[in-house]
Swiss-Prot record:
It comes from the Bacteria. NCBIfam families: S18. One of its GO terms (cellular component) is cytosolic small ribosomal subunit. Pfam families: Ribosomal_S18. Belongs to the bacterial ribosomal protein bS18 family. Part of the 30S ribosomal subunit. Forms a tight heterodimer with protein bS6. The keyword Heme does not apply. Disulfide bonds: none annotated. Binds as a heterodimer with protein bS6 to the central domain of the 16S rRNA, where it helps stabilize the platform of the 30S subunit. InterPro entries: Ribosomal_bS18, Ribosomal_bS18_sf. Residues 1-27 are annotated as: Disordered. This is Small ribosomal subunit protein bS18. Keywords: Ribonucleoprotein, Ribosomal protein, RNA-binding, rRNA-binding.
């Protein structure tokens, strides 16, 4: 087996192929309110299938609201309202 040298490789595309539209923070436009750690249905929007907290680039939240959501999710996990991890996800 031979390896390709750096000069023979195809150049990688730089950046996204199409511009992404900016995500809007649902809390700043009044669509959602961070009410309480007991609102599990709202908190599940910000958790992945495996139980991880989604990053800002996926949720579109501002830094302030992302910190607040993270703390609220962690409180709900400690009170056993949300799981720390989900069971094995099969596709």
């Amino acid at each position: 087996m031979t390896q390709q040298s750096n000069t023979e490789r195809k150049p990688r595309a730089k950046g996204p192929k199409r511009p992404r539209k900016p995500k809007v923070d649902p809390f700043s436009i009044g669509e959602l309110e961070i009410t309480d750690y007991k609102d599990v249905k709202m908190l599940r929007r910000f958790i992945s299938d495996t139980g991880k907290i989604l990053p800002r680039r996926r949720t579109g939240l501002s830094a302030k609201h992302q910190r607040r959501i993270s703390q609220t999710i962690k409180i709900a996990r400690q009170l056993a309202l949300l799981p720390y991890t989900e069971k094995l996800v099969r596709k």
